[in-house]
Every structure is written in C-alpha cells, then in structure tokens.
C-alpha cells in the first residue's frame, strides 16, 4: 500500500484495522462465543469532482453501433489465485493477481480523463470480483441489454506460430483450450472495460496507444439486441443465456443475505418485484397519493442563501471516516 501511494501520488488520510476485530460474549448455555471479522479489506476512495454530469458509470448504452474495449493492466497475465472461480472449483496454489506496474494505472487514468474530455466514452467498469464475465454482466444488468463477448484476442495460444500452425508440441498440451477461455473470463487482474461508439473507436484506441497502452487494449465485445449474455471464441458460441436469468441469479446472493437480516416475507416480495422489473427499461418511478402531492405543492420554497450560510448537520454512520471532507467544503 505504501509503495502504491508513493507511485500514484495519493495518501491515506485515516484508517482503522477492522480485520482483527472480534466480538466476544457468553451464550445462553453459558459457553463463551467469539466471532471474528471477515478477512476482507474495504478501501474507500474519495476525490473532489468538479462536474458530476461527466461522471462515468457501468450503465452500458444499448446502442448497437458501439464497442467494448478491455484495457488489461497486466500484459496478458491471467492469474486465478483467490478468484471466485478458484474458490468454487477448489483450485489452490495459483499465483494471485497483482498490479505489477503501477505506472500503467497512472497512464490509464490519464487516458480516461482525456477520452472523457473529448466525449469518447459511454460507459466504464473495472474488472474485479468475478473477472471479465462479471464485469460484462454487471454492465448489461445496469443497461438492461444483452452483451456479446469475443475472446479470440484473450485466448491466443503463445505456442502457435500462425493460424495454420498445427504442429503438436509438448508445451501445447499443458493446458486445454477451454482452460484458456476460463482464464480469460474469470481472472480478476486489474483492468477496465470501456464502451465507445464505433465511429470513435479508432480515436480511443489511438489515445490509448499514445499513453503506451495499445498492447494492453483489446476490442472484446458489443451490445446485442437479443437481450442475452453470449461468449464467442474461435468462431463458436460457447455460452448464451438470457440476461434476465443471469441477473436474477446475480441478485440472489444479496436476497439471501437480506433474508437472514430482515423480514423474510418482505425480502421475498422485494426479490420477486426486482425480477419482474428486469424486463422493463431502466427508469425511476414513484407513487404519490393525492394528499402527498398537495402537501408537496403547499411546501414553501427554500430561502435563497444570500448572507450568512445556514448551519448544516451531516449524519454520519458509525465507522465512516471520510465525510469530514464534505464538512470542510461546506464551510
């Protein structure tokens, strides 16, 4: 963390070690009970934003004439150690992902800022938990549209000299082709997926090239109008399921956790409503009674702040350490 902060030019203003926290109490049966905190590091980043209207989100645009570009910050490494795939398959001992060259992250940040200033980007999402497959799915869920992934550039056999080179070598049989597909889909190495129009694609790739990221950048997909999540490789469709099916499965983990914490009947109703809403275009709606509407109309307008600023209180949840910045800005 210290090395990254120095190379990236950022600081950690405050922090606390919650990874070693434990709760101890005596149970009803008289036995001593101890629960340790989950060994999961959570880091909250904050920075001033001059114009929130230019913020990028993972919400993919359903426009068909667009492309998805993966910027891979580890030069093709696909380490699976500690990944979701490794956990569910019981695969231990693999090297874990790492940011081997922090300067690539700096270059990516500079390139993204320039691209956004030129209006080249429609959506942005990082590759993290679940790998590229989860990243693409989450973008599709946010935009309520399908996505087709093309993995040819991510599964190139390093031992094949050309497309017609079928000589059998010992090193060629050390890893099955489907293993390369799984590595490409589920490695959790640092990287991002950008969406741009096809008209702007060459300009964006040129900008990435100018920042030394061309070898790390690959066109890997596009939205589709079938509302499906598809994976293609070597001219074959390896996977295809309706987006709504995958989105419901993706939301089920949160639903089960909420069922343990909240009223099960209420969470079941909310989960069912969420599933029904997945077929609708993304929108916000509110239902107000006639009484509520009239009360809103009768509400006096807030006075303009022309003199001394009013006192403002910010309610802070326990354990939240960064909201003091908002207080400083407000003063």
Residue positions per predicted region:
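Intein/HINT protein-splicing elements and their conserved insertion hotspots or analogous self-processing inserts
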Residues: 11, 17-188, 197-311, 318-319, ...
